[in-house]
Amino acid sequence: ELIWFLFIMKFRKLIISLLGTALLTSSVGLSTTTASADTLDDSQNTTEVQPKNLKWAYPFKANKKNGVRPMYNAQTFGITNYMRSTTPPSYFHDGWDFGFSEVGHSNVYAIHQGTVKKVAYGNGLGWFIWVISPDNYVEVYQEGFNKKKDIYVKTGQKIKLDQKIGKLTGSHLHLGVTQTNKDYINKYGFPCKNWNVNNGTWLNPIEVIKSNLKK
């Protein structure tokens, strides 16, 4: 009987040991699986897909019907016949001016989707809308709004292509287009650096719009 009792006790210890090992293995396997899932989720959350071929549009309805027909050379982008600065002497225009005589006091529409970085007032800019787009383009709508109430969007707001963002109440709307990798922000934090320097900072807005114009 003693031998039988010792045999049962030894067998009992073996069973307990095997059960403990099985539970430990199961627990470790579960932890490993959970960790792998967390790692996968983190990887998915941090993966950014850069948008491609985002559409462009003109800022005024009249442009969609009649195209862009500036009345003066000084309204166009690039080297013009109008001196804009004397030190250094420069005839360079860093954007495109849409005059009241062409488009009237009409609504201004977003030429590209993006997020409003700032709505503010600046010397030489007037009230302006500064937009950063997901494809790293930058759009600045300036000089066309006499008062803040003429602007219909606010800082941090996401805007869509062709969304109404304001109303032209001044003599013209100056439209500037650049990219986030360009040196376009001046020491005061305004989006107008190199405004009188033809060094590639500013792009021709009309050419950019026509490159992928929404039909």
Report the location of each language-model feature:
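Small beta-barrel nucleic-acid-binding modules, principally OB-folds
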Residues: 88-102, 133-135, 179, 189, ...
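Sec-dependent N-terminal signal peptides of Gram-positive bacterial secreted proteins and lipoproteins
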Residues: 9-33
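Surface-exposed, glycine-biased beta-strand/turn segments
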Residues: 38-127, 161, 206, 211-213
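Acidic, glycine-rich catalytic/binding loops that coordinate metals and/or anionic ligands
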Residues: 42-56, 157, 177-215
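Short, Lys/Arg-enriched N-terminal segments with co-localized hydrophobic residues
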Residues: 1-8
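Zn2+-dependent peptidoglycan hydrolase active-site motif and core
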Residues: 110-149, 172-179
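A structural signal for short beta-strand/turn segments enriched in small hydrophobics and glycine
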Residues: 114-116, 153-168
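Short, surface-exposed secondary-structure edge patches
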Residues: 105-108, 148-157
